[in-house]
Swiss-Prot record:
This is Calcium homeostasis modulator protein 2. It catalyses: ATP(in) = ATP(out). Pore-forming subunit of Ca(2+) homeostasis modulator channels. Mediates ATP release from astrocytes and ATP-induced Ca(2+) influx in microglia thus regulating neuronal ATP and Ca(2+) homeostasis, synaptic transmission and neuroinflammatory response. May form intercellular gap junctions. The gating mechanism remains unknown. It comes from Mus musculus (Mouse). Residues 14-39 are annotated as: Central pore. It is found in: Cell membrane. It holds the Pfam family Ca_hom_mod.
Amino acid sequence: MAALIAENFRFLSLFFKSKDVMIFNGLVALGTVGSQELFSVVAFHCPCSPARNYLYGLTAIGVPALALFLIGVILNNHTWNLVAECQYRRAKNCSAAPNFLLLSSILGRAAVAPVTWSVISLLRGEAYVCALSEFVDPSSLTAGDKGFPPAHATEVLARFPCGEGPANLSSFREEVSRRLKYESQLFGWLLIGVVAILVFLTKCLKHYCSPLSYRQEAYWAQYRTNEDQLFQRTAEVHSRVLAANNVRRFFGFVALNKDDEELVAKFPVEGTQPRPQWNAITGVYLYRENQGLPLYSRLHKWAQGLTGNGTAPDNVEMALLTA
């Protein structure tokens, strides 16, 4: 029984590691949904005033989406790889296809949160109703045999999102709210459909155009994940041991806890890596092969003692990025 449970946990661990991007996007979407719900309850208050409603409603949908998009761009490692590529190599080693591929990857991942925010805002309908209530055509509103009074129609319609207005026009208020929520939710579902189709077509096109097999692409993604994790962990230990050595040289001793003492004793650090080495392993990386053997990262390429762009006649460069 214990062996079966352990095997199931191992399977789940491998599954989640292989789907880390999908899971991360899902967590981002869930976090955005929670933030949107909290915003609607706590911070959203329609001004119910002509001209102000429109600006407030659009701002409530657009500004948070823009902020989430910029945060997504900032938190994407590919963004800073592209910046480093432009800084150190002026992007001269990348053709238009890889640059377009990299930008698409950055923008696609950054769009998860803002699209989720926009969809939830439209499905709830509050911001849309607030923004467009004053623009409803009064002549199109009827309640039984009565029509909407044209006098001060804009001012009255602008107050409907707050549940205000003359008591004898309450039936019109419900009609306006129902009509605008219908439009808002329709746009929300259409946006979901368009995004789903685009994601599906992008995934199909990516795998169709890739010269690598599905298994090799999965291996490449696993390699990059493991390399990043090991590099970060090793860099943390290296910097800690180096800092301990420098503090000891300055004071003549260093106050270490038991774990730090074990690190210093187990991993002696004599020096640091020169800047050219850091530059060599930093930047945009495409899939490359050297004499038929794959090079899965800039660090892998550097470890093989290869320099330059790796596009000699016996080498192959492909416009591919890891997932």
